[in-house]
Regions:
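Surface-exposed patches in mature extracellular/periplasmic domains of secreted proteins
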Residues: 193-196, 255-264, 386-390, 453-461
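Short, solvent-exposed turn/loop segments enriched in Gly/Ser/Thr/Pro and often Arg
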Residues: 146-149, 198-202, 389-397, 457-463
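Non-catalytic accessory segments of hydrolases
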Residues: 12-168, 192, 425-438, 447-458, ...
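Bacterial Sec-dependent N-terminal signal peptides
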Residues: 1-16, 398
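A structural signal for well-ordered alpha-helical segments within the folded catalytic domains
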Residues: 37, 90-94, 172-175, 179, ...
Length: 503
């Protein structure tokens, strides 16, 4: 009898943490068929509807009984696509998920908080619950936030309601979610002092904003960026510009006040979202005090260890063909010396050259240079380590890419980190190897703020002139800064643009 009782106790203790308590009530997980408890939808803020539309997030309301977090929440309102229709959306969207391997609330595991991409207009947290990482010993959180006009519209009348600033509601949602994590993650077996934020595309840009925002100070200790940074002076939208775009959007909708716009159906707003010009985070003097490149130059940012990666064929999602006219228009926009040099580095004499040059230009301007600028500037003005990575693995499988690819397209990194090849070793042996390496490096970084660990190729901190960039391609090996001559040409041009803006 004693042996049976002991065995029952051990079995009970070995179960995932299927029920716990948060500040608004009790919540119950769903098992994922392995050794994790997955809470698919926990409200971290009140529904941003009615008078709360275009306002900072407010605390979620308590509930009675036990909230069964069995299904992911609906998508935030956004334009319809083939895979998401309006009946799948709701303005009541401020939810997060938690996947935990903890068996008790006392385990104090590191925490990884993911912010999804989607150009600040689209997508959903529910596709990325991160069981692949949680199984390696972290508590994985995925956050939803407001997008499109509902998340980023600024207007002078909204500024009057909020001490002079407006817009950036989606970023305020992310900060509010991180504050919720600080208060509640212990009850999932997580350690609030060991939070790493990570994101892809617009989610990576969000992570960079959080690294720069004084409102996010102390909410995380490390950051991973996958294909996104906010260093470009070409992307700077200030409060006055953003409010002008908001005024134009209101006029297009034939509304005369914020009150009228708050009465509109979210579907009508998102159906016109393409007409909303400023769907980007705003330099509002509050969430983002100054252009982020300026904050980094001055050393005024949250100085935490960072791991920054982009992909070798990012532009494959944008182009499957490029005409002579498209090529000429793109490179004709560059002034004198930069236009001439660009045509050397990005030739366009043949159809194939034009296609690959436009893809490479998209990669280098949109992802490569921002990653380089972030890494080099933080090395110069910060104290925390910087790690740099480059995903070059080509696979038959891709997320969004068009036509022939020469490497990893935009968002392909998600396949490797989510474990898409974990059970396909025979068909995709190299992809499986890369996926396992990336997952372990990422989790090590969350655990120790250093990606290195037993059995992994050594990854040194980034140095511009040395082979310190970890390239993932049929394994992992160190290379010098990829596409270096092109990146330095763009760096020279961006310095010129910044000088014009200052003058």
């Amino acid at each position: 009898m004693m042996v049976c009782g002991l065995m029952t106790l051990v079995a009970t203790e070995a179960q995932p943490l299927m029920r716990t308590h948060v500040e608004t009530g009790d919540v119950e997980a769903t098992p994922d068929g392995t050794d994790l408890a997955v809470y698919k939808a926990i409200p971290y803020a009140a529904a941003p509807v009615g008078d709360l539309r275009w306002k900072a997030p407010q605390p979620a309301k308590p509930w009675e009984g036990v909230l069964k977090a069995e299904d992911v929440a609906k998508w935030p309102p956004q334009p319809e696509k083939s895979y998401v229709k309006y009946d799948m959306m709701s303005e009541d969207c401020l939810y997060l998920s938690v996947a935990t391997p903890a068996k008790s609330v006392d385990e104090a595991l590191p925490v990884m908080v993911f912010i999804h991409g989607g150009a600040f207009r689209t997508e959903h947290y529910g596709g990325d619950l991160w069981q692949s990482l949680a199984r390696r010993g972290v508590v994985a959180v995925s956050v939803e936030y407001r997008a499109g006009a509902l998340g980023f519209m600024a207007h002078a009348d909204l500024a009057k309601e909020a001490d002079g600033h407006s817009g950036n509601y989606g970023i305020l949602d992310q900060i509010f979610a991180l504050q919720w994590v600080q208060r509640n993650i212990r009850n999932f077996g997580g350690d609030p002092s060991k939070v790493t934020i990570f994101g892809e595309s617009a989610g990576a840009m969000s992570c960079h904003i959080l690294c720069a925002s004084p409102l996010a100070k102390g909410l995380f200790r490390a950051c991973i960026s996958q294909s996104g940074a906010m260093m470009s002076p070409l992307n700077v939208v200030n409060q006055m510009q953003a409010q002008m775009y908001g005024w134009m959007f209101m006029n297009q909708l034939k509304k005369s006040s914020i009150e009228e716009m708050r009465q509109m159906d979210a579907k009508e707003l998102t159906g016109n979202d393409a007409n909303f010009q400023a769907c980007v985070p705003i330099v509002d003097g509050y969430v983002i005090p100054e252009p982020i490149c300026d904050l980094y130059e001055k050393g005024n940012y949250n100085d935490v260890p960072v791991l920054i990666m982009y992909n070798s064929d990012e532009g494959a999602v944008d182009f499957d063909s490029v005409s002579v006219e498209q090529y000429a228009q793109q490179f004709g926009q560059l002034p004198g010396q930069w236009g001439d040099s660009a045509k050397v580095y990005y030739p366009g004499n043949t159809e194939e050259e034009r296609l690959y040059s436009m893809r490479d230009l998209t990669r280098d301007v949109g992802f490569g240079w921002p990653a380089y600028a972030w890494a080099t500037m933080q090395k110069k003005t910060g104290k925390s380590p910087v790690y740099s990575a480059y995903l070059a693995q080509k696979s038959d499988t891709t997320v969004y890419a068009k036509g022939n690819r020469r490497g990893a397209a935009h968002a392909d990194d998600m396949m490797y980190l989510k474990g898409a090849f974990d059970d396909k070793a025979e068909q995709y042996p190299q992809e499986k190897k890369v996926g396992e390496l990336m997952q372990q490096y990422w989790v090590n970084f969350a655990k120790t703020m250093n990606p290195n660990g037993e059995g992994l190729p050594h990854w040194p901190v980034y140095e511009e002139e040395k082979a310190t960039v970890m390239q993932f391609n049929n394994g992992a090996s160190l290379v010098e800064t990829p596409n270096q001559k092109r990146i330095r040409l763009i760096d020279d041009f961006m310095k010129y643009v910044r000088s014009l803006r200052r003058n």
